[in-house]
Regions:
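Trp/Gly-enriched beta-strand/coil motifs that build multi-repeat beta-propeller-like domains
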Residues: 1-146
Length: 146
């Protein structure tokens, strides 16, 4: 099951609610990143458990634990202002980052800096991209919402 992570607006505080918990209070609370960072979630190390990270400009700071602390995988990819997507785009069992800019989606299959492994021209620049394993293959793909 997926759990729910909420970040309090204007802060860097994350509240984690475990779906199988009967509590109405957060099961876990911690601070990570800066209030202006954009949160991202994924299974960065392929252990089957999603954790959090943040996007700050074109730099991603990813953690493999649901806790504060130093990033396990900081790297720069894309440009400031890009919209981040996460998913297992190559089917290796670990999530990575894609960024959307001007109607193009730039996919990086590893958590290291550098150029995109693939560039997808799909939909219109104004479309919203969503990620999922829509075919049940273990590989995430894109869909658009218009």
């Amino acid at each position: 099951y997926d759990d729910l992570a909420l970040r309090t607006a204007g802060t860097a505080v994350f509240d984690i609610y475990f779906i199988n918990s009967s509590s109405v209070d957060p099961d876990l609370t911690f601070a990570y990143g800066r209030p202006s960072d954009v949160p991202v979630a994924g299974d960065w190390d392929g252990d089957g458990v999603d954790s959090l990270g943040v996007q700050r400009g074109a730099t991603f700071f990813l953690r493999n634990e649901l806790s504060g602390g130093a990033a396990d995988a900081p790297f720069t990819f894309g440009r400031a202002g890009d919209i981040a997507l996460t998913g297992d785009f190559d089917g290796d069992g670990a999530d990575s980052i894609a960024v959307v800019r001007d109607g193009k989606t730039f996919v990086k299959n590893t958590l290291v800096g550098g150029g995109a492994d693939s560039v997808l021209v799909f939909g219109r620049a104004t479309d919203t991209r969503v990620v999922g394993d829509f075919f049940g293959t273990g590989i995430d793909t894109l869909a658009i919402v218009r």
